[in-house]
Regions:
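Short intrinsically disordered terminal tails
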Residues: 1-2, 115-117
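Short, extreme N-terminal segment that most often corresponds to the first beta-strand
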Residues: 1-25
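Ser/Thr- (and often Asn-) enriched beta-sheet segments in non-cytosolic proteins
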Residues: 5, 54-56, 98-100
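Structural alpha-beta junctions
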Residues: 27-39, 90-98
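Charge-rich, solvent-exposed alpha-helical interaction surfaces
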Residues: 17-20, 24-31, 64, 81-89
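Secondary-structure transition/turn motif
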Residues: 10-12, 56-62, 116-117
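Conserved short beta-strand edge segments in small beta-sheet-based binding/regulatory domains
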Residues: 71-116
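Short, intrinsically disordered low-complexity segments
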Residues: 33-76
């Protein structure tokens, strides 16, 4: 499977935020019974007190995660819902990190449009 850049993270507390993100993504792996579905960019960029790095996922990992969450909640149709889950978890951890899609358009938008109407 190929790796795609999915989320872009801006963080002021690199160690705390990376720990929180690893926790939430490990939970995702447990939910769908898949290992090594995500990884972080090998080098973070540092500028003016902020750390910037990318989260890469395997296409199959994110597809299974969306399908799993869609079965639990039919409103989940693409990885936008996964982004909201991650953002909410970071808020609960009182993190100031900002996470967004690495590009303008979600990866699976076209794939799930016809499947999950």
């Amino acid at each position: 499977m190929t790796w795609v850049s999915l989320f872009y993270v801006s963080s002021q507390d690199f160690d705390g935020d990376i720990k929180s993100l690893k926790t939430v993504f490990s939970q995702f792996e447990k939910q769908i019974h898949q290992k090594n579905g995500y990884r972080f960019s090998p080098e973070a960029e540092f500028a003016m007190g902020w750390c910037f790095y990318t989260i890469y996922v395997k296409i199959g990992f994110i597809k299974k995660l969306v399908e799993y969450n869609h079965m639990r909640d039919p409103k989940v149709k693409d990885e936008k819902a996964i982004l909201k889950i991650v953002q909410n978890y970071l808020k609960m951890q009182k993190s100031k990190a900002r996470i967004k899609f690495d590009r303008d358009k979600p990866t699976l938008g076209g794939y799930y449009h016809w499947l999950l109407r």
